[in-house]
């Protein structure tokens, strides 16, 4: 692991500070989107080698992590924490996707695609784009008022996903945002008991169960229903509703809201693979828990300390997208509106037509 620091000042060159770093933690989550890194730097004023680096890392500075010469992470320092007079200073960093999570915008899109929306909002925020997966799904109208840039992108892709049937995920590749199809399998790597698994646990929960979805039209009248009869019989009703959208198959969209028993696995291992990150799939063979097959990574934490690379993964049986539902904005005329319009007409007043 190589760690480089760039001071937030025009013309500053990267400085290799690896010799002063005692540990590195790098991780991510499907739900939180931005990947993070925490580096612990020795605070030893009497050490000549460390003193010569003249470390004065501050908020907004850039930290780069490399493994075997390949860029693993590029992020900005958000906060620092010092422990002890001659202990360590820890720096918390976020990749540039954090700008999309913390910035909001107002947009009115018509007859465009999720990929074009992504290019537009990134350009407005000064974020470069890399590989943006094409959906080729035309979105008739999407209005955003104060949504985060990340939510704008994911709401567009969530809407497109209802027609493509695919799942999407945002990631930063250095300074460029990419939108990829979620669930890519880690190649040529297996987590296996007795080889690279040091601990594994397995749990089941029905906390997020949905076993019946009622479909409604724009007049709030029920137009259909999808359900899981077996789960209803066993666990009782956990109901959700879905309102029809133009250009979207209502039955398919409603079925995507059904959710059964969630099974979560936590695995800790050594000699980890750098492709074992949130959003990817990984194979597991573990006799103790009975786990055998392909699972999807929801959260990952990789740690480098004393020359050893360990990783902790939270896995799921299902490949789940970080869906952001878009609520259609429709002008609704109330009974009072209609009566007022009728009164104006009877009085001979001019009535505006929408």
Please describe what each predicted stretch is.
Residues 1-99, 187, 192-200:
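Assembly/oligomerization scaffold segments
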């Amino acid at each position: 692991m190589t760690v480089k620091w760039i001071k937030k000042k025009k013309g500053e060159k990267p400085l290799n500070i690896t010799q002063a770093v005692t540990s590195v933690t790098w991780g991510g989550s499907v739900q939180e989107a931005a990947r993070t890194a925490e580096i612990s730097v020795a605070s030893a004023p009497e050490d000549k080698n460390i003193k010569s680096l003249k470390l004065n890392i501050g908020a907004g500075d850039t930290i780069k992590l490399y493994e075997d010469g390949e860029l693993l992470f590029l992020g900005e320092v958000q906060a620092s924490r010092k422990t002890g007079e001659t202990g360590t200073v820890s720096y918390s960093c976020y990749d540039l996707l954090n700008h999309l999570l913390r910035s909001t915008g107002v947009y009115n899109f018509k007859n465009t695609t999720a990929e074009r929306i992504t290019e537009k909002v990134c350009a407005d925020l000064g974020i470069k784009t890399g590989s943006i997966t094409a959906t080729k799904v035309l979105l008739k109208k999407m209005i955003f008022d104060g949504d985060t840039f990340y939510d704008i992108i994911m709401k567009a892709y969530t809407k497109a996903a209802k027609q493509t049937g695919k799942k999407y995920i945002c990631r930063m590749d250095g300074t460029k945002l990419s939108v990829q199809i979620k669930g890519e399998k880690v190649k040529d790597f297996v987590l296996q008991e007795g080889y690279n698994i040091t601990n594994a646990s397995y749990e089941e929960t029905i906390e997020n169960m949905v076993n019946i979805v009622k479909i409604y039209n724009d007049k709030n009248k029920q137009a259909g229903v999808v359900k899981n009869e077996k789960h209803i019989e066993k666990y009782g009703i956990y109901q959700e509703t879905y309102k029809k959208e133009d250009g979207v198959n209502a039955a398919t969209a409603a079925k995507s809201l059904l959710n059964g028993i969630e099974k979560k696995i936590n695995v800790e291992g050594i000699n980890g693979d750098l492709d074992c990150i949130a959003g990817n799939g990984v194979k597991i063979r573990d006799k103790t828990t009975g786990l055998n097959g392909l699972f999807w990574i929801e959260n990952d934490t990789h740690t480098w300390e004393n020359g050893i690379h360990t990783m902790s993964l939270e896995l799921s049986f299902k490949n789940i997208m970080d869906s952001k539902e878009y609520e259609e904005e429709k002008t609704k005329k109330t009974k009072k509106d209609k009566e007022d319009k009728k009164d104006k007409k009877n009085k001979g007043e001019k009535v505006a037509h929408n």
